[in-house]
Amino acid sequence: MDKFFEYIKNQNLSLEDEKLADKLDQLDQLSSIKEEFYFPITKDIATDLSRVKDEDLDKPVIYLTGNSLGLQPKEIEKQLVCNYLNDWRKYGVEGHHKGDHPFIHIDEEIQASLSKIVGALPSEVCPMNSLSTNIHVLLSNFYKPTQTRHKIIIEYGAFPSDLYVTESQIRHNSFNPETSLIKIKPRDGEYTLRTDDIINVLKEHGDSVAVVMLSGIQYFTGQFFDMKKITEVGHEIGAIVGWDLAHAAGNVELSLHDWNVDFACWCTYKYLNSGPGCIAGIFVHSKHTESFNLSTDSRLLGWFGNKLSNRFQKEKEFVAEDGALGFRMSNPSVADCTALRASLSVFEKAGGIKKLAEKSTIITGYLEYLLTHKLKTTDVQIITPSEANQRGSQLSLLIKGIKASQLKVNLSNSGIVCDVRDPDVIRVAPAPLYTSFNDVKYFIQKLNENM
């Protein structure tokens, strides 16, 4: 919260000013970007319309769950109709090579803008598949267990799919998750992991660790791990280091190339706003793709990872496309890539991830300040770290005195959307693209009324 207090001081604002939210919105250079999005309206979201005032029925909701599914950018509708559907109608199969966005190169068009989101070279990223599939794809290449080095390290309480994928990869390689999967637990009475404890576990298991596979931001607690330091230590013990960035991509500043991360993957429907189930993304550091040898490379192969010049030739030996593109197996969905391209264009309009992260720090700090200073109950506990460099937009709130699921229902009747994770945690994410400071103030007002 220190960054928020520093901002208030630098802007000569007062925390006790009743119009503080108005003044913060006036200072917000990104305030107009929310006009780029469609918002659900209250009558379509509320659980009990009898509890909604008539004048509020058609009001846009306050959407605080972009960490689960981002709002729809208006640009997606435009590009799907005017580009994808129009080109398919107009050109048919020739659309692979005609039009402003030929189908055959549709994913390559996104590489440059996607690389800026995660701090990579364009050649190191590729939109493809879905997140869980991509974890399998990348682990099939990077997890090469031996009798002495066979362990995968994840965090305790990782997103279930990360657990299922790592367990199945271990079994697929004829090892036992009971002995080959290490889960790092928080200390007793704590919800988040201390960096020193993570490092100690890595060093304790040392040369028995094949892969370190953590979440960049922990989905339940909202903790942003020290990826740079953890990657360094992982390499010191001789392990490959990969990251699940589902809750980090589009949320915080990342420098995957400079941090020397081996691989990473993420979905694009949360903070990147591409749409439910839309195409995911991968990162493979350039050091791993400088050369390709079919006899020694263990990646899973498919026709779209093959060089375009070789792709339709019968009985030709596979020659990998350069960089991350060589990990593709199937042709990407043109509709998905069109949606992702459109959603990424909104990031460009906003000035990029750096500006968004700056606003995120301030607006999330404002949310934390109101929760700790203006809430009239002690039945709400923030379990997300207070330090700005250890979180993104999400604050996870442990709720007491009322079931979190019931509180979510009550808030929906007030035109507020957030989500619940058991046991009794509400996740609140003031995504900087479409959340105002007055939105945050209203949330606290309604939280007070419903606790």
Swiss-Prot record:
Keyword set, alphabetical order: Cytoplasm, Hydrolase, Pyridine nucleotide biosynthesis, Pyridoxal phosphate
Q: How does it assemble?
A: Homodimer.
Q: Which pathway does this chain act in? A: Amino-acid degradation; L-kynurenine degradation; L-alanine and anthranilate from L-kynurenine: step 1/1; Cofactor biosynthesis; NAD(+) biosynthesis; quinolinate from L-kynurenine: step 2/3
InterPro entries, per database record: Kynureninase, PyrdxlP-dep_Trfase, PyrdxlP-dep_Trfase_major, PyrdxlP-dep_Trfase_small
Q: Name one GO molecular function term.
A: pyridoxal phosphate binding
Location(s), subcellular: Cytoplasm
This entry's Enzyme Commission designation comes to 3.7.1.3
Q: What is this protein called?
A: Kynureninase
Annotated binding of pyridoxal 5'-phosphate, by residue: 131-132, 159-162, 215, 244, 247, 269, 303, 331
Is the keyword Hydrolase assigned to this protein? yes
Q: Which cofactor does it need?
A: pyridoxal 5'-phosphate
The main enzyme category here is hydrolase
Give the catalysed reaction(s), semicolon-separated.
Answer: L-kynurenine + H2O = anthranilate + L-alanine + H(+); 3-hydroxy-L-kynurenine + H2O = 3-hydroxyanthranilate + L-alanine + H(+)
